[in-house]
Amino acid sequence: MNGVYIRVLVLQSPSETFIRIQHEPVGREEGLTTEQLKAIRFTPQFAAKEVEGILGPELTTAMEFCDWSTRNIAVPDEVFKNLHTFLNDTQMVEATGTTGFYSFVSRFTVGLDVDGKANNTVPIPE
């Protein structure tokens, strides 16, 4: 799910460094590659299918869900059902809650400039 956290941050605040720096190492520990991290960061919203070869079907579907939830709030039934093929009911609640919560967190940390780095450039994954 770390890919989802990072994607919310990309959509909410492209310059947000605090949380992204916190989550990139965790994403790597969970198996995300540099190429996947770059795809999550640089793929335009609603274009997850373009990087499915990099992300794989599950992460692509999660990214599509995240894009809809973060940018449109209402998630189309088809997008919800697609993610539900990979996640059980409890995990769907967690994915929806995580996406919404991280929308709040990104606004909170940027608004308060929690670590004094709100204006810093976010490093590109290496």
Features from the language model and the residues they span:
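Hydrophobic alpha-helical segments
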Residues: 1-126
